[in-house]
Amino acid sequence: MGQTEPPEVVVVNDGSTDHTDTVIGEAAEVMPLVRLDHKASLGRSGAANAGASRASGDILIFLDGDTLAGPHFVSSHLEMHRKGPGLVGRGETHQLRCTRFFADPETGSPRPGEEERVAAMSAAELSRMRVTLHDVVERFQSVHDRSQPGIYPGAGPRRLFELEMEALRAYPDCSVLWAAASGSNQSVSRKAFLACGGFDEAITINEHRELALRLCKAGARMAPVDGAFSYHLTHRTGWRDPVADTAWEEIFYAAHPIPAVPLMSIFWASLSDPLPFPAVSRITSLPELEAAAERCRGVVGIEKVRQAHFKATASEIAAK
């Protein structure tokens, strides 16, 4: 909605039990869309694969259901893909912290447990924090002006965003750029997506990075999509942290037994405070992740790789 280059929109209602059905129905009245409804949830990866199978365009762009697309979102992704074949696009992911108290940012209705906080807002504060359809269609700059870089609030997510985009722009030959993939703002040719088998449906978190790694192994190259802004409507509950929720890691590593996979969690944790490990073992950029993975080449096993990294970094400091 409000795109400078009209897209084909495929919406997957993956077994939702809330008012999602109504929201999709209302959207279908004002814009053309292809709708898929699942009685039972297939999970994030399964839902994305189902949507991709129904898409007819040459380029697939993935966007989460709680995320807005800026006016140049589609046109920027398409322009990037016109630069050459074999590209996987990563757009600029922002978040809207102002929506964190609302079940519906349009009306300002509170999330469960936030009733008192929302009731205490002045009319002016409520107006500043709501994100309405009118804002999206007629005055999107006001939405952008209220956003911050990163998918979630906080210094860590913002720094991660900055490091990922910096690596994509400044280190195009870095071998671990697949780790900069974004599930809520990522594009790939439909042909390449289908050829590699789509998302691994056994992985329900971090699936976008696993897909990006497979695509890169097949010869694709990660690239930044400047100007393709997405805006995550921040919510305090209902999201999963890949550092704390590590169910993805064993499946990911079984498919790709390379050191960079278990070292990703050290990279992410290095951006937090306090550190859960000695400061000398921090990994603070994707080129550093690449170097750390190279040092651990030949080490097999998730925990063995991490312990090898800790030992190697401690030894380097001791040698100095």
Residue ranges and their predicted role:
Residues 72-154:
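Conserved donor NDP-sugar-binding/catalytic core segment of glycosyltransferases
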